[in-house]
């Protein structure tokens, strides 16, 4: 009987080592899923942040376009056009009335020029160097000049602007030094030196800085006799004219619609209310000056407003769109902040303006909303509105005001002022501070006898010394006192001035040039006080305007009256005259552009909806980044754990493989 036997082969354990890096990498890839999800969230936030940036840019662009419509002056601007711009040009304020004017320019205004006798040197000393005072007075010369010298009977009437002085001494008593001292003093005289080519070639030329007949010079010199003989100039004295007049001071002479007009300057702002005319040359041919509303600029600004609004509206629509066919939503679709902005803008545009005159909606000037949320301009309706209601169009856009009384003017408003029309009642008009004499002034002033007066303006004191003379009239004496008082260093340094004249009773009267209780004129003595003002002069401080606006108390400062409570709070008006009692109404409108601009400013502010939304997104992005960092930190530990575990397993399997090989070898020997 035969028998057979077989030997079993042991299974191979861990025939090869594990690929630990690959295993760990695959495991870690799975662990990355939460990070990938958070990175997708970050991408979404960043996309929204970019979208909000585009919205902010569109809002800023729209606000920039609004600026030209928030200013009433730009919306109510006028143009002034001359038929011959080589003869004259002009500018018109918003207050100018449209119209056409015929102007003929006879001669231009010019400054007086005086020329001194020639000197042989620019730098040689003139005179002894003793301290010398040049005193300049400006006024009107009445008389005839022959060869630059005025004859007998010539008069000089001071303009009352004050005596201006220049000091010459041993440091500057050359011709060049005198020139530089006069220019440095800034007294309204320009000094220059001309070389005429003669044996005494250097001649000092003095030119009044201002044009006009009333800016002729009278120069007195005290001190060095040589300088006095060179520069003293009294046009009323045939022996006192040491300078020669080469150009006489002249007013500009023109005719406006046939009416003769004489003005001191070639820039004239008081012949046509609200219009400044600049004369360039004489012309016997009439020039037509046309003042008209600047409708072209307003039309351009309105179209810019609509274009910028449409760009913003399109941006908002794009960011919040939903495509039903593809079932995809824009990045900010459903965002509450953007939805609120769209709603707020529509609300502003669809609210009627208050206090805007005859117009209260954009539709009345041809601006209408379209189905897609944009605006469209009907150019025909806009042109008609500008033609028929130019001033009221401004009230539709800007913060504007107007008064029904011609002597009451809208001034300004505050953020507290509500749109509306408010009644005005005046209980007291503003007055000037004044000092009025009780008797006619004596016209003869004698040095050391009656030539000084001590005065105070708004509490600032000045002692005046009146030049001794027998004055031609009480008005001439008043002009001299006005000139001295305004020329006082203390008074001019305080930035105040006065006007002096003769009242209906023939008495001297001095008044401040500003209205209100802060202004006064006082007389504090002097040897000439009683002779000029009498024994009982009357000093009266100015008063402030008083009254109500919309029935509420208002605060008056000078001629300015400001409402202090109610809907009109902060509304300020200028009452320039008239009577006490009811003075009509004042209207205020804040307009669409003004309201829109305030809204956009708040929207873009640090606490506004757009800033808050972007801040929230940035915070969310930061929070997600922290979450990712935390997870990544955990994954580092987990990766180390996986590596350790599988490395240990791999080592164990390697050991088992070695044992298996040994056993296999031993079994094969049986």
Segments predicted by a language model, with ranges:
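Bacterial flagellar/type III secretion structural subunits and associated motility module proteins
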Residues: 1-43, 56, 64-202, 207-311, ...
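N-terminal, post-signal-peptide region of Sec/Tat-exported proteins
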Residues: 43-51
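N-terminal alpha-helical signal peptides/signal-anchor transmembrane segments
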Residues: 48-49, 62, 66
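Alpha-helical transmembrane segments of integral membrane proteins
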Residues: 50, 303, 333, 615, ...
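Long, contiguous alpha-helical "rod/stalk" segments
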Residues: 51-58
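Surface-exposed loop-to-helix/strand elements on domain peripheries
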Residues: 318-339
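Structured, hydrophobic secondary-structure cores that serve as assembly/anchoring elements
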Residues: 320, 324, 636-668
């Amino acid at each position: 009987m035969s028998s057979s036997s077989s030997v079993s082969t042991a299974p191979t354990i861990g025939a090869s080592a594990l690929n630990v890096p690959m295993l760990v990498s695959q495991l870690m890839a799975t662990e990355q899923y939460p990070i990938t999800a958070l990175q997708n969230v970050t991408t979404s936030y960043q996309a929204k942040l970019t979208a909000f940036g585009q919205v902010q840019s569109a809002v800023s662009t729209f606000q920039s376009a609004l600026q030209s419509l928030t200013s009433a002056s730009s919306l109510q601007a006028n143009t002034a056009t001359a038929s011959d711009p080589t003869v004259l040009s002009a500018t018109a304020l918003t207050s100018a009335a449209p119209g056409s004017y015929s102007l003929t320019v006879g001669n231009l205004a010019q400054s007086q020029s005086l020329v001194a006798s020639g000197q042989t040197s620019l730098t040689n000393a003139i005179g002894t160097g003793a301290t010398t005072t040049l005193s300049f007075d400006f006024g009107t010369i009445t008389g005839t000049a022959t060869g630059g010298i005025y004859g007998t009977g010539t008069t000089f009437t001071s303009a009352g602007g004050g005596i201006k002085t220049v000091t010459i001494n041993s440091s500057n008593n050359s011709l060049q030094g005198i020139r530089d001292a006069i220019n440095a003093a800034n007294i309204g005289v320009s000094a220059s030196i001309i070389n005429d080519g003669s044996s005494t070639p250097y001649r000092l030329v003095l030119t009044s800085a201002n044009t006009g007949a009333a800016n002729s010079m009278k120069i007195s010199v005290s001190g060095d006799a040589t300088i006095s003989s060179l520069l003293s100039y009294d046009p009323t004295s045939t022996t006192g004219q040491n300078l020669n007049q080469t150009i006489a001071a002249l007013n500009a002479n023109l005719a406006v619609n046939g009416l003769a007009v004489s003005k001191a300057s070639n820039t004239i702002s008081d012949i046509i209310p609200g219009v400044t005319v600049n004369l360039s040359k004489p012309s016997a041919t009439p020039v037509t000056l046309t003042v008209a509303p600047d409708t072209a600029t307003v039309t351009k600004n309105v179209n810019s407003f609509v274009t910028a609004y449409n760009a913003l509206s399109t941006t908002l629509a794009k960011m919040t769109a939903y495509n039903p066919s593809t079932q995809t939503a824009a990045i900010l679709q459903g965002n509450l902040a953007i939805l609120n902005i769209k709603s707020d803008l529509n609300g502003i545009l669809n609210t009627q303006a208050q206090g805007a005159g005859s117009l209260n909606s954009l539709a009345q000037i041809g601006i209408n909303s379209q189905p897609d949320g944009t605006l469209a301009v009907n150019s025909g309706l806009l042109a008609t509105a500008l033609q028929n209601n130019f001033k009221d169009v401004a009230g539709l856009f800007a913060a504007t005001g107007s008064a029904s009384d011609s002597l009451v003017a809208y001034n300004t408003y505050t953020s507290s002022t509500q749109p509306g029309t408010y009644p005005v009642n005046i209980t007291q008009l503003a007055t000037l501070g004044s000092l009025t004499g009780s008797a006619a002034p004596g016209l003869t002033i004698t040095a050391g006898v009656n030539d000084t007066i001590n005065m105070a303006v708004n509490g600032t004191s000045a002692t005046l010394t009146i030049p001794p003379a027998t004055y031609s009239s009480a008005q001439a004496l008043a002009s001299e006192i006005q000139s001295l008082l305004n020329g006082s260093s203390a008074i001019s340094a305080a930035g105040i001035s006065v006007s002096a004249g003769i009242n209906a009773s023939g008495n001297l009267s001095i008044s401040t040039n500003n209205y209100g209780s802060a202004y006064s004129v006082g007389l504090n003595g002097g040897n000439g006080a009683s002779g000029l003002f009498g024994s009982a002069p009357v000093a009266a401080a100015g008063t402030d305007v008083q009254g109500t606006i919309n029935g509420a108390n208002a605060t008056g400062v000078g001629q300015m009256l400001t409402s202090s409570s109610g809907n009109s709070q902060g509304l300020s008006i200028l009452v320039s005259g008239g009577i006490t009692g009811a003075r009509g109404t004042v209207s205020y409108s804040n307009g669409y552009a003004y309201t829109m601009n305030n809204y956009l400013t708040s929207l873009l502010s640090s606490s506004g909806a757009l800033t808050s939304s972007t801040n929230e997104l940035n915070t969310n992005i930061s929070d997600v980044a922290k979450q990712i960092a935390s997870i990544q930190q955990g994954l580092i530990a987990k990766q180390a754990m996986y590596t350790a575990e599988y490395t240990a397993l791999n080592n164990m399997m390697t050991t088992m493989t070695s044992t298996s090989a040994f056993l296999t070898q031993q079994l094969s020997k049986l």
